[in-house]
Amino acid sequence: MLEYVTEAIVLDKVDLGELDSRVYLFTRDFGKITAKIKSGRKIISKLASHTEPLNLVTVRIVDKNSPQLIDALISKKGIPGKTFFKIAALVRDISPEGQSDRNLWELLISLIGNGAEAGDFIKVLKILGFDPARAKCNNCLKGSPDFFSIKDLIFYCKTCYAG
C-alpha cells in the first residue's frame, strides 16, 4: 500500500455508484491521477466541497488496488469560466495517466490565479503535443485549422468541421 501527499488541480468529478465519486486530478508530482472518493456524495462528506472542479488542493491518496482519495484541503479556488472548463476537459481526456509535466502544471496554476482566456487553450494543446501552427485539417489538408476534436484528436478547418 502506497500513500501520496501532493498538490493537485481538480479537473473533474463524476458520480460513481450510489454514494461514491470519481475525481480526476492533475498533480504536480504525478501528472494526471484518477481516484475514487468513498462516500463522497454523502451530505456529511468532508471531501465533497474540497474536490469541486478547478480547485487547487493538497490531497492524500492511498493506492492499494486502485487510487483512493482519502483527504483533501483547498489551497485556492479556481476562477470558473467556459474556457477553463474546456481546458480541464482537454487535460482530463488527453494527458497520460501518471506522467508528470511541469510545463502543463505551471500553466494550469497560473490559470487558477488569473482565469483562462481563449489563447490558453492553444497553449495547453501545444504542451500536450498538438501544436495548431504545425497542423492541417484532417479532411482537406488545409493549413491553419480552426477546430480541434478532443474525441478524435484531430484538427479541422471551418469548412470541414461538423460540430
Regions found by a protein language model. Name each.
Residues 1-21, 26-163:
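Non-catalytic alpha-helical scaffolds and adjoining flexible linkers that form interface surfaces
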